[in-house]
Amino acid sequence: MYLPRLYLQRTSHALSRLSRLSRSSSKLCTSQFVLHPTRYFSSSSFPMSSSNTDALVEVAKARRSYYKLGKTSPVSDAKVEELVNNAILYLPSSFNTQSTRVVVVVNDKHDKLWDIAIEQFGNLVKSGAISEDQWNNQTLPKLQGFKAAYGTILFYEDPAHIAPYSEKFAAFKDKFPIWADHANAIHQWFLWAGLESLGFGANLQHYNPVIDTAVAKEFDVPSDWRLISQLVFGSIEGPAGEKQSKPLEERIKFLGGK
C-alpha cells in the first residue's frame, strides 16, 4: 500500500494532537451542565489553542484526491461507522434542519454499487448517448477503478426535512435547498478528511442522476431522497496528483484587521 511520507507525517502529527484534545474534551464534558440530552455547554468545553488549530489545518492539508485505491482497510468497519455517526450527530445544518443522509457501502455492497453504475452507463452506450470510444477509454476504466476501492459513502438530502422550514420561513423558501447543499458539503469534507486521517485514500464523484433509481432500488433508499455525491475510499495504492492553487490575493479579502 502506497503511503507518501509527507502524508504520514502530517496525519500522524495531527491525529496525535486531536487525540489529546478529544481526551481532554471528554473529561470536561462529564462535568458540564446539560442543556440538551445529547449536548453540553461550557465556555471551556473545547479549549482551543494554536496547537489544536494547527492540528486541524494539518488534517485539511493532508486531504487529497486519491484515485488509485485498493480493497485493504487500515481500520475496522466499526471505526468507519463511528466516524460517520459523529458526522451526522455533530456537524451543523442551516436552521438545524438535519436533512443530510448517508448510505455507507463496503466490500460486496460497494462492488454492487459500481456494478450498477457500469450497467447504467453501459445502457447509455447502447442508446448512443455515450460513444464506444469514450466508454472504452474513459468512462469504463474510471468506473472499474472506483469498484477496485474498499467502500463508498453516498450522500443524500431528504426534502421532507427541508419542506417544513420552507413553509415556516417563507421569505427564505427558495434558499433552503441551497443551504441544505451547503450542509451536505460540510459532511462531505469532514468524512473525506476523516477517512484519510484514518489511513484511507478517497475521491469524490458525482454519477447522479444516471445511477439514482437503480441504486435506490438496490439499497432500499427512499425514492424522494436526493443523491448528491459519492465518496469513494480505499487503501492508497498510488500518489495523489499535484495540487495547483490560485493566488490567495485573488480569493480572499481580509478587512479591518489590526
Locate predicted features.
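N-terminal chloroplast transit peptides
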Residues: 1-25
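N-terminal amphipathic, basic helical "cap/leader" segment at the start of enzyme domains
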Residues: 2-6, 28-29, 36-151, 256-258
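C-terminal helix-cap and adjacent tail motif
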Residues: 52-60, 65-67, 226-258
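Small-aliphatic-rich amphipathic alpha-helix that forms the alpha element of a beta-alpha
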Residues: 83, 87-88, 159, 168-215
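Short, hinge-like loop/turn segments at secondary-structure boundaries
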Residues: 120-121, 221-223
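A generic local secondary-structure boundary/capping motif
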Residues: 141-144, 217-221
